[in-house]
């Protein structure tokens, strides 16, 4: 081997100096080359696909992961991997479509004539679909004929109607995914970092796993159901200070205090995952980031301990994607969203006005969308999926009809009698209504 070729091989084996600055603590001073390569390998090792994912999708994903690891030697590979991840989404959807329909599907052509297509792979289906000038397939639990163009756009619509992808924020992300795919396919030179490449791979892994029915613990897009602990929220009515802790810890102190307490089920795992809005809890309205359930109160510490020991409430798990909320608009005021069961227990005077049942991943989006509707802002959909907000309006009208629609949409409308109690932080940060001028 010549000296020149030896130097060329050594250059290919050397860690790219740019990768050394991407540390577990963020950008910083350079790590050792071996440590930098090991860190990137350990990152990508966390991305695991479910066992039942289609083999062709798995092979492509593993190829991307291998390319990511090699980015330690060639920094440009991070850009190539991130771009290829955008294109791989369509392959995953194609493979899931082929598996879902089991090799046979009935389609409609433009004249509404039906054709049965028997296929072995998605490309096989696609060729036959074009040949019969297919335009529609049946989608969803209602088996409704819907337009299907067999491209990424149509596949994403199909996956959502079949319940294989979900979440209203993810619906907006899907629109961005389509734009990114097109930008990648017709783009120009650009350079991405390992952070962006890993995010692309991580998101792709979550989407693929969810297409095959598996959520991701701690996931960004499709998180697994999260644990709600029994939490005591206490506040000082004089100073307005608010504290929170596990209800089981209330009995650990011998003395009583002057705080007012309520007990709720809420996401509360200090150091792991907390609800950022827990201190703004309102028993009647949805003000927390994750669903919170009223259990007891208000009362003193002694009373809270007594109820907790007698009732022995247990933690549970909850899913916060695609929740259903109801929200009231009355006399120019947009009120805070409520959970359907709580709204069902309202007195007649509190039921007046126009109500909306809205599907969303959190109450903030519901409130913002309803405020936009009340202010007659352009572009917001009064029914169905909103193009501007990550929400879907299910129904509007009086409370009774809206609750009935919420139940049909899968929401639990069992009546929950909640007291009119909220923390001082809620009074300060989250007014119960705003006045809107249309």
Predicted regions and their residues:
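Extended intrinsically disordered or low-complexity regions, especially N/C-terminal cytosolic tails and loops
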Residues: 1-74, 78-82, 226-438
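Amphipathic, non-membrane alpha-helical segments in soluble helical-bundle scaffolds
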Residues: 46-57, 75-82, 142-145, 149, ...
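Short, flexible helix-adjacent loops and helix caps
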Residues: 69-73, 97, 189
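Short, hydrophobic, well-ordered secondary-structure elements
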Residues: 75-101
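Eukaryote-specific, cytoplasm-facing alpha-helical/coiled-coil scaffolding segments in long proteins
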Residues: 90-92, 110-123, 207-213, 227-238
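Flexible secondary-structure boundary motifs
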Residues: 96, 100-171, 180
């Amino acid at each position: 081997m010549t000296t020149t070729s030896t130097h060329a091989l050594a250059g290919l084996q050397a860690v790219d100096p740019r990768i050394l600055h991407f540390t577990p603590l963020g950008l910083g001073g350079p790590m050792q080359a071996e440590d930098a390569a090991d860190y990137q390998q350990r990152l990508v090792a966390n991305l695991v696909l479910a066992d039942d994912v289609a083999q062709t999708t798995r092979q492509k994903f593993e190829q991307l992961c291998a390319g990511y690891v090699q980015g330690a030697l060639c920094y440009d590979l991070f850009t190539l991997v991130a771009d290829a991840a955008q294109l791989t989404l369509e392959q995953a959807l194609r493979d899931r479509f082929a598996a879902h329909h089991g090799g046979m599907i009935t389609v409609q052509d433009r004249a509404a004539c039906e054709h049965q297509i028997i296929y072995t792979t998605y490309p096989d289906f696609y060729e036959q679909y074009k040949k019969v000038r297919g335009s529609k397939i049946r989608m969803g639990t209602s088996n409704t004929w819907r337009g299907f163009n067999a491209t990424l756009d149509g596949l994403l619509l199909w996956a959502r109607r079949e319940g294989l992808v979900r979440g209203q924020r993810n619906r907006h992300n899907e629109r961005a995914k389509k734009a990114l795919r097109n930008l990648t396919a017709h783009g120009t030179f650009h350079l991405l970092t390992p952070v962006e490449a890993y995010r692309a791979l991580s998101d792709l892994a979550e989407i693929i796993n969810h297409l095959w029915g598996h959520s991701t613990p701690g996931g960004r897009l499709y998180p697994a159901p999260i644990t709600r602990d029994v939490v005591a929220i206490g506040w000082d009515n004089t100073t307005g200070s608010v504290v929170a802790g596990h209800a089981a810890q209330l009995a650990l102190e011998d003395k009583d205090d002057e705080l007012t307490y309520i007990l709720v089920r809420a996401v509360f795992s200090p150091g792991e995952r907390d609800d950022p809005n827990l201190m703004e809890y309102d028993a009647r309205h949805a003000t927390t980031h994750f669903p919170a359930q009223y259990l007891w109160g208000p009362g003193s510490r002694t009373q809270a301990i007594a109820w907790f020991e007698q009732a022995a409430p247990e933690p549970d798990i909850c899913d916060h994607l695609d929740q259903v909320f109801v929200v009231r608009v009355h006399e120019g005021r947009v009120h805070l969203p409520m959970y359907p069961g709580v709204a069902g227990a309202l007195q007649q005077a509190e039921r007046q006005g126009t109500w909306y049942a809205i599907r969303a991943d959190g109450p903030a989006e519901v409130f913002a969308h309803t405020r936009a509707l009340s202010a007659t802002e352009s572009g917001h959909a009064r029914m169905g999926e909103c193009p501007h907000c990550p929400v879907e309006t299910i129904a509007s009208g009086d409370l009774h009809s809206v609750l009935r629609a919420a139940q049909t949409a899968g929401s639990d409308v069992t009546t929950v009698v909640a007291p009119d109690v909220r923390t001082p932080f809620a009074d300060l940060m989250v007014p119960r209504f705003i006045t809107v001028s249309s």
